[in-house]
Amino acid sequence: PVAENLRAEPREFGRLIQDAVGIEAIVNRVTVHESAEVQSEWFQSTHDDYGIENIVLVGGESSNIDYLGPSVVESSELISEINSEPGREIFCGGIAIPSRKVESLRLLKKGSGGIEYFTTQVLYDSDNISKMLGHYQDVCMKEKVSPKRILLSFAPISTERNLNFLKWLGVNIPEATEEYITANQDTIKGRSLEVSMGVLDDVLSHISS
């Protein structure tokens, strides 16, 4: 049902946030479903027409599928070409999915291919992200490269419908966490915030240990 709803233009929403709050917006862009030419035009328009300089590139669901459009690394190369033109500077990011196997190696490859930073999938558990950060640090030290910045993503909810939407998006929510958050409809918002803050505290403790 979500896929059938009319979606707003994310760049327009990003521009509204920038104008209203005064902070730079980050817009996600799936790269694989349209040609390199279309993607390049979209990147240029995002910068020139919407004033958005931060784009997170999102690839396909499987490396076994032959997609029409460019990969994340190929898209970052397109952005590098755009950035070579006077007056254009797009900061190019990628997605980190902590629950995915050997994600640290994917981050290393994408970082070497031009990705400047990563945003995580929405976090409702600290175990996978802590492991991923540790593994990523290890592989970067082994390869003698500097780790890229990783931005942690949180999306507290206020209703069970919000939670179901996150699950539809593929967010990993442990069963025990879901049961705790939804045990009482009147406390979903508070418990969701509590879980998000707990995950952040756990990750910060892991990093500093």
Spans of model-derived segments:
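Conserved, mostly hydrophobic/aromatic
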Residues: T46-H47, K110, G114, L152
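Catalytic-face loop-and-helix region of soluble metabolic enzyme cores
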Residues: V145-S208
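Glycine-rich phosphate-binding active-site loops on the catalytic face of alpha/beta enzymes
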Residues: N54-S63, S112-N128, S209
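Ligand/cofactor pocket segment of small-molecule handling proteins
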Residues: E85-E116, T120-D125
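Active-site beta->alpha loop and helix N-cap motifs at the rims of alpha/beta catalytic domains
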Residues: P1-V102, Q185, E194, S209
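Short, well-ordered secondary-structure micro-motifs
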Residues: Y67-L68, S104-L105, S130-K131, R161-L169
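Active-site glycine- and acidic-residue-rich loops that bind
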Residues: V32-V38, G69-V73, Q121-H135, P156-S158
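Short, well-ordered amphipathic alpha-helices
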Residues: I79-S80, I129-C140, D201-L204
